[in-house]
Amino acid sequence: MAEPEVLKGKLRLPVVGAPLFTISNPDLVIAQCKAGIVGSFPSLNARPTSQLEEWLDQIMSELKSHNRRNPEYPAAPFAVNLIVHRSNNRLEADLELCAKFKVPIIITSLGAREDVNQAVIGWGGITLHDVINQRFAHKAIEKGATGLICVSTGAGGHAGTLSPFAFISETRTWFEGPILCSGSISTGEGVLAARTMGADYAYIGSAFIATKEARAHEAYKQGIAEGSAEDIVYTNLFTGVHGNYLRSSIKQAGLDPDNLPESNPSMMDFGSGAKSDAKAWKNIWGSGQGIGAIQSVESTRDYIDRLYFEYQNAKGRICGCPYS
């Protein structure tokens, strides 16, 4: 793969921090980028739209300042996640702000929009579209997406059911552009595994919930740090799209996690006034299956430093030259 110009030589690790609905914020994104990975956030986390402009200004200003002070260790680029579903009545306004700030990476979800892709490429950015199967993957590329985020089984939040081995290898038979692997990755070994199976980058989300910078309730962070794969429930009840959630939070809501009804996908609403979806993600905690490797709440920098050591050490074990 020819690495996109906006990413070439700018990453300490081949990792993109996934946008976490209600949780990602400027502090987390800035910490991720300063530590050498792509940081991202959903535009809808900034409410109202005017706050999005404040967030973009803060992130860009702090990263530029960091780069001036640390020319030998520049920050990685950041990304904004846009929900392109027809119910998101903020899309046009949010896209205009991203254009104003020339956001380098746009992550698109829940629909493929040719006009959005063209706009981003027009200002020099790239678009990464998250997909759960080959039909959506082909559609995204046909609509002009730069790269694909293959959301596999076990991923936190909205997730698919395909094995990452099957998903990545099949996608690689027809697509030579950037591929990101999403699903249960929380260690440096997992990052290397994603690269080895054919992905260019690992996409990590749930692990960042248990960081000091994340805008999550302390009980949520502890739930990630103390949880395991067995604590994850896959359901479409809360947003109309299948996703993975912490069992304990479902119980706290007075529901039986083993007997949840099906939702009606036609009821999805991602508009700026959508209270039901925001409530679902606030009270019912999304999480992927890879949280068993997260043992404590720590700073974003410490977690990424550990990822880097694990990644280098795993490469060393494979080639017989231990990292030190």
Q: PLM features: residue spans?
A:
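Active-site entrance/lid segments in N-terminal catalytic domains of soluble metabolic enzymes
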Residues: M1-P178
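Acidic, glycine-rich active-site loops and adjacent beta-strand->loop/helix elements
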Residues: R86, G154, S184-I185, A207
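Conserved active-site-proximal phosphate/metal-binding subdomains
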Residues: T161-L180, S186-S324
